[in-house]
């Protein structure tokens, strides 16, 4: 697994031995960034269920303002931190080694807003709808922002979750990317 573009281009990232962490393949990541690249520059990113931190680090490499990495696994967070250091993006990074609900609630209380929110949790733990609802309830998504949910192609998602609506879906073998945006007020 590597950083595809930007100031850390070509950097090989550390990956865990833990099977719960399923890093986004380079092929899927490249396709994803072809879609979301207009959202990256100078914006804030939330990498929920960060795993290796690959998606957030890719955004920072491409010019994102900052990224908050959230993962409750100590092993995953150790890898995220080592990858942040390796990519030399410590100043633009915040790490939260807590569960997603606590993180989302805390970030909401602080008034944080994000233009890109990644949700790439282990496939067998179906917390996506809960995570989408929490993000909506805590007003974390900028009005013009986008949420990217990476999941197994067998899983289907509702058209709407609170004020969020499904704007797009792309399939890559057994991996699907589902995109949500905020309904206009």
Predicted regions and their residues:
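Class I S-adenosyl-L-methionine-dependent methyltransferase catalytic core
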Residues: 1-185
């Amino acid at each position: 697994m590597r950083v595809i573009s930007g100031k850390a281009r070509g950097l090989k990232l550390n990956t865990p031995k833990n099977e719960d962490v399923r890093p986004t393949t380079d092929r899927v990541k490249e396709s994803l960034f072809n879609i979301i690249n207009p959202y990256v520059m100078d914006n804030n990113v939330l990498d929920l269920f960060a795993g290796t931190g690959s998606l957030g680090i890719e955004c920072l490499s491409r010019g994102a303002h900052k990224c908050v990495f959230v993962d409750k696994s100590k092993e995953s967070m150790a890898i995220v931190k080592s990858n942040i250091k390796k990519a030399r993006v410590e100043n633009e990074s915040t790490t939260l080694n807590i569960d997603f609900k606590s993180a989302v609630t805390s970030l909401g209380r602080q008034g944080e807003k994000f233009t890109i929110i990644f949700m790439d949790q282990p496939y067998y733990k179906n917390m996506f709808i809960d995570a989408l609802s929490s993000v909506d309830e805590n007003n974390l998504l900028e009005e013009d922002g986008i949420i990217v949910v990476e999941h197994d192609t067998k899983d289907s998602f509702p058209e709407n979750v609170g004020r969020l609506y499904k704007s797009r879906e792309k399939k890559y073998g057994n991996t699907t990317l589902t995109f949500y945006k905020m309904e206009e007020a």
